[in-house]
A protein has these predicted regions:
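FIC/Doc superfamily catalytic core
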Residues: 1-187
């Protein structure tokens, strides 16, 4: 016959175990995404094919100018260092044999976030500009907000994705884009 103390410990263990199982279940997508990332098997899911808005160098620079006017910044904020920003905008529409390399809105947005963050096209504000253009692109394509009006990408998620890209190795570009697209598909 089990001792009363052991029964109480087992009951607590069972409650703690169930609580942990519930938490893990609630975070299953995040844990599965991390596992897929670790094993280099992330795939692109749930994306929006229909693009309503086409980003150009000119309309992107107008958006950046609006950011600068509204939020200010240093004298160097948003000053282009070279032509790499123009290249970044063009690259999200790159094709091979007439087939887009980034066919979905989410892939283009993720690539835009990646390229503007990594290319350091501006003297100051690259991460802020990249995050703003990411949101701008999603907004203009009608997918920044959920049907109920809530944010599709939480503030903390945007910061995390941008910093993750900034700290990533160039050879991890494809995986970073997949992570961003997967997070957007789930949010």
């Amino acid at each position: 016959m089990p001792k009363k103390g052991n029964y109480m410990q087992n009951e607590k263990f069972d409650k703690d175990t169930q609580l942990l199982v519930d938490v893990v279940t609630d975070y299953a997508f995040a844990l599965d995404t991390l596992d897929d990332y670790d094993h280099q098997r992330l795939v692109l899911r749930k994306s929006t094919a229909a693009e309503k808005f086409h980003a150009t160098y000119e309309n992107a620079m107008a958006a950046i100018q609006g950011l600068k006017e509204k939020f200010g910044g240093s004298e160097l904020f948003a000053n282009e260092k070279d032509d790499s920003f123009k290249s970044s905008i063009g690259q999200i529409y790159q094709t091979v044999g007439g087939v887009e390399l980034y066919p979905s809105v989410e892939q283009k947005a993720a690539m835009l976030l990646y390229l503007v963050t990594k290319n350091h096209s501006f003297s100051d504000g690259n991460k802020r500009i990249a995050a703003t253009l990411f949101l701008w692109f999603l907004l203009n394509n009608g997918i920044l907000y959920k049907d109920d009006g809530s944010k599709r990408v939480a503030d903390a998620t945007l910061v995390t994705m941008t910093l993750m890209i900034a700290e990533s190795r160039p050879e991890d570009m494809e995986m970073m884009v997949k992570v961003v697209v997967n997070l957007m598909g789930r949010l």
